[in-house]
């Protein structure tokens, strides 16, 4: 008799298996699980995750993430008590799919009743609890860099008191200071943290760019001066951290939660001027990277993606839109552009990643553009099935009439390969 070494279940039962005897302390958690669980499972299947890995991924969502998602959003009811930085509508949950490596990622902002009620006005408690629990689950998650940037980029108790006294009422959006992301790969998880120093900037008078660069400098990493110099030069960052071009705004630092020697640092900006020339400048570091063949090859593919998406060029005035949940963006809404650069002591130039935000664009048009780009890349299977996949994630809507399903597309190019991720609306 053969004794199986793995417990398996029919694919269609993976969600039901965990749901059957699940218990949640609140209706909000139950609703988050019932909505996000099937959605995640569909993405995992489409990304060709082995069946044996699907249940652990869902279990992590159910047990660790769902308890930190806060109030479940409902159309027509009161606005969410906490406006998250994760998505356009302030929802603290976003799924994305790295199409080259077939990696599914969940971006989220851990919340608790303390943040939603205003007791924890800058939401410091829930992210700390959640990331500590993540680190207990997987010994590859290292919090050394997380602790470093927490110390330098989060408001202190004294700064909190001052902000609440002197700057009240604080804006609805932008109060969050840290978000997390988990990726499911090779039967395990990897994690990333993102720091938004907007509140620290408001409290100290120092710009977000200066706060981020100073915190990186305090790591005292040998070899990091040159890539930081090239980044400063490209963005025209002055000593105070402000770019000479006021349309460009540093706003975010990303860091891998792994051993410090492997942890990447990512410096993020928004750009209110959306044009191909701006994209090319960011990609090439104003021409400095053109000596690298990888740069030119990636730029050529990025140009094809840009042309296929046909993003309208121009100046974007609305950096933080205030859309009511359940209401589509206005037809004339166009978001800013985003970019990040990976800073490594092992590389002379920082590696760029460009985010072409597509909220407000017709979803059918975006899907047609993506399918055409998949064909350019030789991803013929994905090209032939992509529209059906998206329809399974969002059953019901007529994509010729929606403009919010595809939040954006990110593109980078490393090791002679295009890295393309698609970001989806959580609802």
Swiss-Prot record:
GO biological process terms on file: verruculogen biosynthetic process
Amino acids binding substrate: 94
Major enzyme class: transferase
E.C. code: 2.5.1.110
Pathway where it operates: Mycotoxin biosynthesis
Reactions the enzyme catalyzes: 12alpha,13alpha-dihydroxyfumitremorgin C + dimethylallyl diphosphate = fumitremorgin B + diphosphate
Keyword flag Transferase: yes
Family to which this protein belongs: Belongs to the tryptophan dimethylallyltransferase family.
Protein name: 12-alpha,13-alpha-dihydroxyfumitremorgin C prenyltransferase
Organism of origin: Aspergillus fumigatus (Neosartorya fumigata)
């Amino acid at each position: 008799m053969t004794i199986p070494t793995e417990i398996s279940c029919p694919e269609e039962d993976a969600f039901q298996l965990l749901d059957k005897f699940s218990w949640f302390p609140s209706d909000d958690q139950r609703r988050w699980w019932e909505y996000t669980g099937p959605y995640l499972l569909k993405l995992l299947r489409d990304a060709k995750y082995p069946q044996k890995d699907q249940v652990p991924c869902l279990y992590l969502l159910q047990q660790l993430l769902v308890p930190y998602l806060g109030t479940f959003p409902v159309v027509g009811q009161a606005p969410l008590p906490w406006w998250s930085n994760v998505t356009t509508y302030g929802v603290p949950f976003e799924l994305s799919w790295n199409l080259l490596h077939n990696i599914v990622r969940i971006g989220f902002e851990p919340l608790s009743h303390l943040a939603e009620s205003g007791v924890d006005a800058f939401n410091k408690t829930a992210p700390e609890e959640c990331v500590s629990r993540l680190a207990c689950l997987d010994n590859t998650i290292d919090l050394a860099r997380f602790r470093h940037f927490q110390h330098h980029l989060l408001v202190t108790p004294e700064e909190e008191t001052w902000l609440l006294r002197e700057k009240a009422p604080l804006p609805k959006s932008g109060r969050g200071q840290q978000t997390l992301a988990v990726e499911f790969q090779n039967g395990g998880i990897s994690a990333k943290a993102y720091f938004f120093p907007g509140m620290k900037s408001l409290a100290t008078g120092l710009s977000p760019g200066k706060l981020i660069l100073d915190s990186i400098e305090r790591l005292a990493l040998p070899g990091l001066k040159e890539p930081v110099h090239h980044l400063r030069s490209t963005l025209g960052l002055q000593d105070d951290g402000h770019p000479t071009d006021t349309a460009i705004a540093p706003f975010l630092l990303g860091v891998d939660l792994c051993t410090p020697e492997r942890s990447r640092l990512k410096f993020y900006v928004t750009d209110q001027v959306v044009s191909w020339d701006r994209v090319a400048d960011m990609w090439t570091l104003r021409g400095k990277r053109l000596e690298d063949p990888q740069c030119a090859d990636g730029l050529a593919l990025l140009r094809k993606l840009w042309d296929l998406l046909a993003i309208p060029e121009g100046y974007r005035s609305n950096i933080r839109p205030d859309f009511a949940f359940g209401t589509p963006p206005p037809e004339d809404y166009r978001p800013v552009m985003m970019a990040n650069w990976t800073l490594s002591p092992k590389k002379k130039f920082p590696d760029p990643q460009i985010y072409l935000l597509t909220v407000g664009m017709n979803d059918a048009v975006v899907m047609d553009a993506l399918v055409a780009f998949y064909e350019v890349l030789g991803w013929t299977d994905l090209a032939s099935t992509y529209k059906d996949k998206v329809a399974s994630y969002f059953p019901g809507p007529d994509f010729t009439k929606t403009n919010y399903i595809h939040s954006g597309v990110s593109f980078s190019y490393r090791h002679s390969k295009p890295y393309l991720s698609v970001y989806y609306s959580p609802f």
